[in-house]
A protein has these predicted regions:
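Auxiliary N-terminal substrate/complex-recognition segments of SAM-dependent methyltransferases
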Residues: 3, 104, 339-340, 370
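A short, conserved structural fragment
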Residues: 347-356
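Immediate flanking context of iron-sulfur cluster ligation sites
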Residues: 1-8
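C-terminal scaffold of the Radical SAM
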Residues: 1, 22-46, 54-332
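Minor-groove-contacting beta-hairpin "wing" of winged helix-turn-helix DNA-binding domains
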Residues: 357-361
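Short, amphipathic alpha-helical interaction segments positioned at domain boundaries
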Residues: 363-378
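Short amphipathic alpha-helical interaction segments
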Residues: 332-344
Length: 378
């Protein structure tokens, strides 16, 4: 089994916090779509993964994939069917902005095999949405969910953000409760990050806004966990919550070392032995593909790199690391090292071993980066 990621780097406007590679120029959509389809032809599963793996999940991310029209999307799915072996019970996700979920967009969706939508709600406060330079308003999130339900989409995920400058705990509670009332199947929630190079980062450095303190951010995170688990959501990854049976299969594959193929500018591929990534620049990507050249670089993964990857991905999940499988794959020496390093964290209540799995406790989740860094082999 394997996953397929398609990167759509187009956005109508750019949010002030976004550090992902994207462009607000839409004039290259036709050429870019053609290049995506050509890359799929040039990068079959056997070449990308070393074997003809069956694709079980597809994820259209960005950017904003909903900036493509029906013709573009039909062209992409035609190329997917032509170049890959597809499983029967697939999860096919598309990211979109709430204001893109119009009647016309829903008519397009009805003609496509997409069965999961991931929307960036971020907050239900219009003032904070304007602060982020988001295009939609709070009411459009509800309208989008209703429209998607009406065309038969039964797996909807929304993203939330917390830790806005001067955001109160009651305001954050209001956002969480609003999300619960929408009764979506999946919720992802992230602390607002000040990534270098973004407008938000410059506002912080210029003293125009202040970052909330770490203890207050922790309180917000704990409130998130309490509210969502109390409403019946499973907390299955540091930032992700799902109704039973609705965990993101595609993202879970990243966290459990499942191979995946990345198509498009800046997309990454992984097959357990090698990691590769495409060039970011869209025009260079299109030109290279047109010339029959895959614009990518790669690195071979030695056992220590793979071990580090295991730590930084699998420990993010509630499942944690299967210790028996870990020893079978990495050998007794590394398995013993892992257990030895874990003892101090277990004694401090940051980790636990249950049913042969090593995982973070609730106390360990908030400082997961610090905990995981202790296991890394430099």
């Amino acid at each position: 089994m394997a996953g397929l990621y398609i990167h759509i780097p187009f956005c109508e406007s750019r949010c002030i916090y976004c550090g992902f590679y994207s462009t607000t120029s839409l004039k290259l959509r036709d050429d870019y779509t053609n290049a995506l389809c050509r890359e799929m032809q040039m990068r079959p599963a056997k070449a990308a993964l070393g074997s003809n793996e069956t694709i079980e999940t597809i994820y259209l991310g960005g950017g904003t994939p909903s900036q493509l029209n029906g013709s573009h999307l039909n062209q992409i799915f035609s190329a997917i069917r032509k170049n890959y072996t597809l499983a029967e019970n697939m999860e096919i996700t598309m990211e979109c902005n709430p204001d893109d979920v119009t009647g016309d967009f829903c008519e397009t969706l009805k003609q496509l095999p997409i069965n999961r939508i991931s929307m960036g709600a971020q907050t239900f406060c219009n003032e904070r949405l304007r602060f982020l330079h988001r295009r939609h308003n709070a009411g459009e999130v509800e309208e989008a969910v209703t429209r998607l339900r009406n065309i038969g989409i039964r797996n909807i995920s929304i993203d939330l953000m917390f830790g806005f400058p001067e955001e109160s705990l009651s305001q954050w509670m209001s956002d969480i409760r609003h999300a619960i009332q929408l009764d979506v199947e999946h919720i992802s929630a992230y602390s607002l990050m000040y990534e270098e190079g973004t407008p938000l980062y410059h506002m912080l450095k210029q003293g125009k806004i202040s970052e909330i303190d770490e203890e207050y951010s922790r309180k917000m995170y704990e409130t998130l966990i309490d509210q969502l688990t109390g409403a019946g959501y499973e907390h299955y990854e540091i930032s992700n919550f799902a109704r039973p049976g609705f965990r993101s299969r595609h993202n879970s594959s990243y966290w459990h070392e499942v191979p995946y193929i990345g198509i498009g500018a800046a997309a990454h591929s992984y097959n357990r032995k090698q990691r590769s990534w495409n060039i970011e620049n869209i025009q260079t990507y299109i030109r290279s593909i047109s010339d029959g050249i895959l614009p990518s670089e790669s690195e071979q993964l030695d056992i220590f790199t793979r071990y580090n990857d295991l730590i930084t991905t699998t420990l993010r999940t509630s499942d944690g690391i299967n210790l028996m499988k870990m020893e079978q794959e990495f050998g007794k020496e590394l398995a013993d090292r892992l257990l030895q390093e874990a003892q101090s964290h277990i004694s401090r209540g940051l980790m636990k071993i249950k049913n042969g799995r090593l995982s973070l406790t609730r106390e360990g989740l908030y400082i997961s980066d610090d905990v995981m860094s202790d296991f890394m082999i430099i």
